């Protein structure tokens, strides 16, 4: 994971260290008031994929612009080679690709899974910015709304009630 708009610079520095990396880029037409230009822009903002040995991880983390590795319990998570191959195919095609991280939609029934509100269920009423959502929690005699991060909720299955 990189600082915003630092993907190309980070990818170049990793390449200088002779460590294999992949920055999925997509060609897109950018329009200014006076001209149009075809530019290459990262397909997934703030991500550079690195095929690093354990000894290289610290070296990569020290690169200016690198924020962190995707990790679980402090250990970097490997991305399956098949997924990287699929990204390479997408980037090599002429298809216009749009990346969406919104897995929730207005009206979804959700349950809070983290924090002091764990177990509360409600209806998602707004998907906001920065991975936040607003949910309406219906309790007897009350109608509450709560701002909460998307990683603190789960979508209820169709057979689950609020």
Tell what function each PLM region has:
Residues 113-120:
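Short coil-to-beta-strand transition motifs
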Residues 120-126:
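Short beta-strand-centered aromatic/proline hotspots
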Residues 1-109, 124, 134-162:
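Acidic-enriched and Gly/Ser
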Residues 130-132:
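A generic structural signal for beta-strand entry/edge sites
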């Amino acid at each position: 994971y990189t600082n915003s708009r630092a993907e190309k610079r980070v990818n170049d520095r990793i390449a200088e260290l002779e460590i294999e990396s992949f920055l999925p880029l997509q060609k897109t037409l950018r329009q200014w008031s006076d001209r149009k230009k075809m530019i290459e822009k990262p397909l997934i903002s703030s991500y550079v994929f690195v095929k690093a040995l354990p000894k290289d991880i610290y070296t990569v983390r020290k690169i200016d612009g690198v924020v962190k590795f995707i990790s679980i319990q402090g250990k970097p998570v490997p991305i399956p080679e098949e997924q990287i191959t699929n990204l390479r195919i997408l980037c090599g095609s002429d298809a216009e690709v749009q990346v969406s991280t919104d897995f929730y939609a207005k009206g979804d029934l959700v349950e809070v899974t983290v924090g002091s509100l764990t177990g509360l269920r409600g209806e998602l009423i707004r998907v906001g910015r920065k991975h936040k959502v607003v949910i309406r929690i219906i309790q007897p005699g009350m109608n509450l709304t709560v701002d909460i991060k998307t990683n603190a909720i789960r979508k209820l299955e169709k057979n689950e009630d609020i």
